[in-house]
């Protein structure tokens, strides 16, 4: 989930010569967690820029996914879109949509106090995999792309002091 600022998290998939046999994206699989029903998110595909960051959109239209409430493995069919896997690699990105139907209000206690903090989050959450080195995960926030930083503070194991990359699987076809 994210707070009131739009965010896009992106993961790089490097090209492999075996993809020449199945060069088109057939579908994408994600692990989604949502506290609201029918939460919407956007999938985007980007080329790889000169500095290794996400660059230009590969597919211009929004690919809207809808998540039911709870934890789900979700597959989105891309076969009608004719998206070719570029030989320079491909960023797959997950965009949180800051819209009313994605709002989730949460309240939690302040340490050593009787007061509580109220926050509005925007669902759904996307699954992340912990990795020790960040070679391919980026975050678009406040108008620019930045490498994802290590999880800090009260992050649960196995994420603490590691990086999180999108838990995404791409299925290719010819």
Question: What residue ranges belong to the model's regions?
Answer:
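Beta-sheet-rich sandwich/jelly-roll-like modules and their strand-loop junctions
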Residues: 1-48, 95-96, 100-174
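Aromatic- and Gly/Pro-enriched, solvent-exposed loop/edge beta-strand patches characteristic
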Residues: 40-116
């Amino acid at each position: 989930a994210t707070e009131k600022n739009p965010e896009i998290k992106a993961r790089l998939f490097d090209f492999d010569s075996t993809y020449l046999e199945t060069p088109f994206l057939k579908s994408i699989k994600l692990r989604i967690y949502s506290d609201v029903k029918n939460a919407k998110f956007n999938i985007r595909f980007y080329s790889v820029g000169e500095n290794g960051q996400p660059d230009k959109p590969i597919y211009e239209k929004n690919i809207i996914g809808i998540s039911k409430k709870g934890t789900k493995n979700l597959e989105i069919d891309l076969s009608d879109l004719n998206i070719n896997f570029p030989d320079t690699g491909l960023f797959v990105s997950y965009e949180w949509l800051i819209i009313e139907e994605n709002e989730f209000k949460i309240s939690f206690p302040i340490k050593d106090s009787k007061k509580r903090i109220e926050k509005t989050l925007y669902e759904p959450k996307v699954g992340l995999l912990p990795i020790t080195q960040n070679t391919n995960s980026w975050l678009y926030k406040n108008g620019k792309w930045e490498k994802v930083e290590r999880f800090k503070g009260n992050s649960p194991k196995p994420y603490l002091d590691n990086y999180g990359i999108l838990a995404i699987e791409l299925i290719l076809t010819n």
